[in-house]
Regions:
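Secondary-structure boundary elements
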Residues: 80, 84, 98-165, 173, ...
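Linear, non-domain "peripheral" regions
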Residues: 1-119, 183
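Short alpha-helix boundary/capping motifs
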Residues: 9, 163-168
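Hydrophobic/aromatic-rich core segments of domains that either
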Residues: 21, 137, 169-192
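Short linear sequence elements within intrinsically disordered, low-complexity coil regions
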Residues: 16-18, 150, 175
């Protein structure tokens, strides 16, 4: 499948910045299930300084922000070819141990609503992969995407109770459910 991605992030500051830095994780890499055909990033208000791989092997871009800056606009335009793999990349050879991704964070800690939602999968005899797919499918049926309905500080439980959220909320709910069910789960990156 060929995917065309156009993405714009705008950051507006309440007062002009005298100095700033920004780390971007907006450069996908080729792997077994995707090939990056074209990928362009345009930065208005900042200058790319260098790239590096973080502890998850994400390609990061380090920016410095222009002096006296009121707004930064980062736009991405790219095309990726993917191979259907049911969402499974395989062994990504993590540098961090899987047990690290079983721990809850304040954002992913499940409350009573998420725990109740997950109970039906606790004793099923399905494969682990099937359970992960069932959870993702049921979250998508239960929670509706609505721009502006949450913030970066909204917990998975709060978004789940509201039955609404944006990409990050779907991810946080999914991670919360999987960790409650005993899986190691972490956010990589991507689009919904």
């Amino acid at each position: 499948m060929n995917l065309t991605i156009k993405h714009i992030s705008k950051y507006k500051f309440s007062k002009n910045l005298s100095y700033g830095v920004q780390r971007l994780r907006l450069k996908p890499q080729n792997n077994k299930i995707q090939n990056i055909n074209r990928w362009n990033i345009n930065i208005q208000g900042g200058v790319e300084q260098f790239e590096y791989l973080d502890h998850h092997q994400n390609l990061c871009t380090f920016l410095t922000l222009n002096n006296d800056l009121k707004e930064i606009i980062i736009s991405v335009d790219g095309q990726i070819s993917t191979i259907e793999s049911n969402g499974i990349l395989g062994n990504d050879k993590p540098k961090t141990k899987p047990w690290m991704y079983k721990m809850y964070t304040p954002i992913t800690k499940p409350g009573n609503h998420i725990k109740s939602f997950c109970k039906k999968w606790l004793d099923l005899s399905y494969s682990e992969l099937d359970i992960c797919h069932f959870v993702a499918y049921d979250i998508r049926k239960f929670v509706k995407f609505r721009k502006g309905s949450t913030s970066a500080y909204t917990s998975a439980e709060d978004s789940f109770k509201k039955k609404t959220g944006v990409c990050q909320d779907f991810t946080h709910i999914f991670i919360s459910c999987l960790r409650f069910l005993g899986f190691s789960a972490r956010y990589v990156s991507g689009y919904l």
